[in-house]
């Protein structure tokens, strides 16, 4: 039996995502993209953004589609150690997230 999370419980979801993205950019500048520490921080940040976006669709900006970020979130959460999925995660970390976040600004 599946346990589903209720939707639209966090009215500040867009603000939380914006804050997570700001911290993501800070750590990217601080560590650089080749550092494994940044890889872990970025992966967890994208995972959290995907969760917030998927479970709070009513509070997302107009035109924002959470499916790509949530798909990457699933890759991170479930198949993080696989080489092929690691490449997909790196592509999201190195530019894909910035494209998706344009809806928040």
Region roles according to the model:
Residues 1-105:
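Solvent-exposed interaction patches of small proteins and small membrane subunits
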